[in-house]
A protein has these predicted regions:
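Short acidic N-proximal helix/loop "leader" segments that mark the beginning
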Residues: 1-21
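Acyl-donor binding region in acyl/amide transferases
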Residues: 92-148
Length: 148
């Protein structure tokens, strides 16, 4: 069995175990409301919990210019109706529209970008503090594996 299939089976099993405590679902944001839920979670984790000092356009929202170009993978708790985990994904075609990758604002990616093939940048990863038992990150990995 190929590695990707084994990983998918593993993460599906992890998701079933996670469901015994919480009703969790992995999905992509499909509305502005979903994006805001991801941005609120990022604010809670990065700014409130970790003390990051980032420019805020809105109170309680962690966002930047790349958000509207990206896909946002969410783990949603169906019982509490909130995002409890998220990834921000920027494909190569989205990066062209965004004027580059977020990582290019921090690092020189000249050599990386010269490598043939397609690239995907994954960032702004976070998990709600009450859900850090492995289930949410497993669901995020499963969703990312399916996306790839």
């Amino acid at each position: 069995m190929p590695l990707a299939a084994r990983l998918e089976n593993y993460f599906d099993a992890e998701a079933r175990r996670a469901h015994s405590k919480h009703r969790l679902r992995v999905r992509f944001a499909d509305s502005l409301e979903d994006l805001r839920a991801a941005q609120r979670l990022r604010h809670r984790v990065f700014i409130e919990e970790m003390g990051a000092r980032l420019p805020l356009a809105e109170p309680g929202i962690e966002s930047d210019r790349f958000d509207h170009y990206c896909e946002h993978l969410l783990v949603w708790d169906e019982d509490t109706d909130q995002a409890v985990g998220c990834y921000r994904i920027l494909t190569d075609s989205q990066a062209v529209r965004a004027g580059g990758y977020h990582a290019q604002t921090e690092f020189d990616l000249t050599r990386v970008l010269a490598v043939p093939g397609r690239l995907v940048e994954v960032g702004r990863t976070c998990v709600h503090p009450d859900y850090r038992n492995g289930a949410v990150i497993g669901l995020l990995w499963s969703g990312l594996a399916r996306f790839m």
